[in-house]
Amino acid sequence: AWPKGRTVVEPSITIGAAIAIVAAECGKAVSKETKVDILVTPLVTICVGVALSAWWAPAIGAAASAFGQLIKDATVLQPFWMGIVVSVLVGIALTLPISSAAICAAFGLTGLAGGAAVAGCCANMVGFAVLSFRENRWGGLVSQGIGTSMLQMPNIVRNPRIWLPAILTSAVTGPIATCVFRLEMNDPASGVASGMGTCGLVGQIGVYSGWVNDVATGVKAAITPFDWLGLILISFVLPAVLCWAFGLFFRRIGWIKEGDLTLS
């Protein structure tokens, strides 16, 4: 068990999938090599998986927890700076092979901080979807826009500069969410939706659920057109326009080249 009072962010299932692949390949390597293959193959697969988990998980978990703590520390800043820092960091966490939803849930990222988190996630998901449209067309638009921007990680490793348009976009939309529209995430699920962005529209549904809950409890008088305008602009319009504009600039100066954003 983890020590009391310590918040732990578990490694993403993406890391678990990578470990499973390595373990499976090791199992295949010894398959059909012995007369007791039915025992050796699963034994090697299990042992390799357990060994890699014991080796990698503590370090990855510690790094994810430290990253989450950094996000939590940013929530005490003034709304403008908090909007920038939280939006950028949660957006980065969403695209990295760690779970932004787990981080937001573990640290209870709700209220204005939750709204900034939604802005950062949308900046990465919608941003990458629009930024890479010329390479990936409609399939890429859907898979990244309502799926995950994590699909771009192999391309980011090859050319980290392709991430700059989405990061800059999140730095702009975050403070707009907190200071202009006062976008809050008060979903009863306690922060999970804050780290989901447009994935299945969970972030937007979470914001709406929070509005409904606030109206029911008397915290909010009513859901206004200004609320809807803010949600639509922060979630879809601004990420698409800003990331496309930033991307156009970086393409012109040669930092992003044709094919850099192609999904394999």
Feature locations, PLM:
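Pore-lining transmembrane helices
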Residues: 1-264
